[in-house]
Amino acid sequence: MAQYSGSSLTGLESRAEHVPFARADDSLASIVGQIVEHQVPPHAIDGLERLYGSLYACWRFLRLCDPVPPHTWIAYQRDHMVGVLLFRINAGLVRVQTEMFILDETIAAAFARDVFSRYRDASDIEFNAVGLTLPFTRLACQYFAFSENYVLALPDSVESYQQALGKSTRKTLRGYGNRLLRDHPSFEWRYCLSETLPRHVQRALVHQLQEFKRASMTARGKQVKIDAHETTQLLRMAADCGMFGLGSIRGKLCAGSLALKIGDSYVMMLCAADPAFSGYRLGLLACYWSLCDCIKQGARQCHLLWGRYRYKEQLLAVPVSLHRLRIYRSRWHMLLRPMRIACMTARGWSQRCRAWLRSESPSRQGRIVRGCLSVLKRFGSTYHAISMQK
């Protein structure tokens, strides 16, 4: 029985049996895709949040970056929505806008099947910052890991979370928490949903937390650049779905957090403390209390995003590798693009070397590798710029 992908609204149909990605005896044949051009339907918006719980897969956020609606691909399996991807096409390159979620190979193959069947001039599909259920053996593709997103699966209760923490972590949290309350008995932690706070208060809180973050990083010899446009986007999302954690002493803010609710997940956008209280590990305490607040709200998971910090693993967050993925129309089309293959390979080796350098002490070999990385980076950047101009 032929499976169809397409939309009755746009008349886009493609027989899956004519596309080389599908085999009659596997799960791919049971996935029916729908392409809706130049719009994101309401049920797709809900599906993005329900399926992925990621800020960078959420249309409410993506439209702040680019208000022009992209194309939407929606996948169904046995009448259940199993995938939603937003994408744009430019000069034969399909760029997927949906990011920071786990991409299953079957969903990737179904998407490639439908897109390559519908858009005959499309040569490649590019995903940025997606987790992959490796290995990808079905597709003609290249991929490499370049970052990570720390994700914490949340239990049903704060008590269960406390019991799951390591003995040393529980001791640290209890010890510093008791010391903070002993030295500052007026300390109070509470959470507020954004709907209970005026906009000007939300804005003041975000700016104060950013200043705490900047001061803390400066104290460690690092620089933080705060982008005004990104802050505006953050404030708009905070007003829509934010939860603030507030720590105060005698009514003055000394620590806090901002998490955004996407589907049944939270994304921790800010968590910072006044560096004057660094002796109490107040930053760690604030993150822990914020995670407890997410549990109280019934969240399924919390994204702590990128950045390798020990406290994330102390609080049981697990790193999920983020990949850049390029899918080619076929292995033959892939072989016809040697420069593109070389560029992806060079960028992949560059990231592997960077990961190695992070785990090794400075050495002569390290300096040599850094020099090679500089060459690889220039090569990749030059080719990417040329390909964008075509």
Residue ranges of each PLM-predicted region?
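A conserved beta-strand-loop-helix scaffold within acyl/acetyltransferase catalytic domains
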Residues: 2, 6-82, 87-93, 134-149, ...
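N-terminal accessory interaction module
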Residues: 77-79, 94-105, 109-118
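Short, high-confidence coil segments that cap the C-terminus of an alpha-helix
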Residues: 68-70, 120-124, 242, 296-299
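PEST-like intrinsically disordered, low-complexity C-terminal regions enriched in Ser/Thr/Pro
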Residues: 366-379
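Hydrophobic beta-strand segments of well-ordered beta-sheets in folded domains
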Residues: 16-20, 96-100, 117-129
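Active-site/acyl-donor-binding loops of N-acyltransferases
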Residues: 2-26, 136-164, 297, 301-365, ...
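Aromatic (often tryptophan-rich) hydrophobic motifs at membrane interfaces
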Residues: 110-116, 224-337
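Non-catalytic accessory segments adjacent to catalytic cores
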Residues: 107-156
